[in-house]
């Protein structure tokens, strides 16, 4: 059985995505995913060679990133699962563990907590789409859990456990939290009220208020009334023009 190294895929790439891709070239025994890279184990060495030749430097995933596929070197294999079956990591030990390869649909935070709490006090479990962070109270508990749970089964899935990069995990959470808390306030609370009062009230006063209506109507109505009054003023003249004739005939 030979295994190949796969790198440069999207961070949210799933275990099933890689298994589906490389199963096209032969029987895949297992896929061991790490943080940013993976090892794909083929039953036949010729299938592994064919997969390297046809997938290296090809685009993959939603981000259309170019894969890096090559034969796995001995030191790369030791970072995953050595012959004695224990986990080996060249990362600095932290209190937080990085967990992948679990079932993202069936696995809940409580399932993850039950899986790790026999090895120490679990302070926090943060689950994402297809990976999780498990934070322990002490460094000793985290190391004990890493040695005991790497390549263990969680809901019928063999999970991979490593030390988390503390800086990357904390920055992600702080950025996501601040973005959720602060983005609604300037858009919803600050903008609508001043725009509404400044834009609508002057137009309403200029076009719908009672003052312009009275200024437009009253002069016209007054002029028409004065003309009517002048028309009625001719009646005395009419009476005066007819009265001499009527007097003469009389």
Curated annotation (Swiss-Prot):
It comes from the Eukaryota. This is Serine/arginine-rich splicing factor RS31A. PROSITE patterns: RRM (PS50102). The keyword Nucleus applies. Pfam families: RRM_1. GO terms for molecular function: RNA binding. It is found in: Nucleus speckle; Nucleus, Nucleoplasm. Residues 177-191 have a biased composition (Basic residues). Signal peptide: none annotated. GO terms for biological process: mRNA processing; RNA splicing. It comes from Arabidopsis thaliana. SMART domains: RRM. Residues 2-74, 95-166 form the RRM domain.
